[in-house]
Amino acid sequence: MHLAFVWHFHQPIYRDPDTREYILPWVNYHAVKNYHQMARLAEEAEFPGTYNFVPCLLEQVLEYVGGSANDPFQAALEKDPGKLTYADVRLLGKIVPGETNARRLQELAVKALFSSPLTPERDRDGLLDLRKEVLADLLPSYLRLRQKGLAELTTTPYYHPILPLVFDVRSADGDSLPELPFRHPEDGKSQLAKGRAYFGKIFGFEPAGLWPSEGGVSREVARAASAAGFRFALTDENVLWKSRPAPHVPADLFKPYLAESLALFFRDRELSDLLSFEYQKWPAAAAVEDFVAKLEARRKAAGEASILVIVLDGENPWEYYPGNGVPFLRALYDRVKRLEGFTLTSLAGYLAAEPARDEIDLVPGTWLG
């Protein structure tokens, strides 16, 4: 059985359109703490994965790298401790509650910007310098992983819109639809094309793969994505079961389908959600063994030439795990790599060997429904 892990990286635009100042620090925070960590762990374990970068996130990362982005949190970290204002102390106190000494508060807050199991011991100024180094090397580090065969890079429509609703809001189920029609396929097509082109400008190649925001797909979206140059997209198994006539066979999940000339992979919802929302409550070893047992059960049900796809947020879950998820991910990567009967793969690589053949009459949907 082939196995693909897809890690989704997304932050919306936090830049004020008038002042150009960053209102919230989350691009800064996740880039240094989590995107860097995911690249480090993949390289350390030589563990192949797929990483999905939203274009508007890339835009903001590059502004931080170039020094044109600043946010109140970063400004408070860089101030002389004696010049911290009450507002600065309150802001840093949200990261490090209970600390009243200004210098100590800054030191603890800047340490919180990093994944502690992967960070060398340095003082505040040393960590601020390290932050700049990490940001500057962030995107190149993923290109290096790609060159080593350890990373497939994919993207999303530019500003992370839910495409079926942009193409036609009437594609949504339910009674709570706006009275006025909303149908702007031209905007959806523009965001697909703009996102793919911007990704290509930054990384030097245009991506084959697409994670449509929230896994939002429809026949119209699939047609537009294919026309924009994407060869495959990913969504949730919920969409597969809505689109396939009953009875549903579990093995149907473990292969790609064709919709409007676009290959579609459907993620395993249970396994993706266990990593996102459940395993942080478990001891790492027990969580990994439970995950492996579920993988083995799926392999037995899937048959030959099958692929199991796991897609989840690659940034937010880890703060709820001990050690920012590092001990768990190390254990998971090590155990999965040693599993017999599984091959870690890229989605494009799988399609090259096993092209999608079965057509699917795609029903509009997202991972939510």
Predicted regions: what is each one?
Residues 175-212, 294-311:
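CE4/NodB-like, metal-dependent polysaccharide N-deacetylase domain
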Residues 189-247, 316-339, 343:
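Catalytic domains of cell-wall/extracellular-matrix polysaccharide-remodeling enzymes
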Residues 1-118, 248-369:
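Active-site and substrate-binding clefts of carbohydrate-active enzymes
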Residues 52-57, 157-160, 211-217, 348-351:
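Short, solvent-exposed turn/loop segments enriched in Gly/Ser/Thr/Pro and often Arg
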Residues 27-38, 131-140, 180-198:
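Aromatic- and glycine-enriched glycan-recognition loops and surfaces
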Residues 41-46, 138-155, 170, 226-227, ...:
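Acidic (Asp/Glu)-rich catalytic clusters
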Residues 84-137, 147-182:
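Active-site-proximal, well-structured secondary-structure segments within enzyme catalytic domains
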Residues 162-165, 174-186, 191, 238-240, ...:
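Positively charged, amphipathic and often flexible ligand-engagement surfaces
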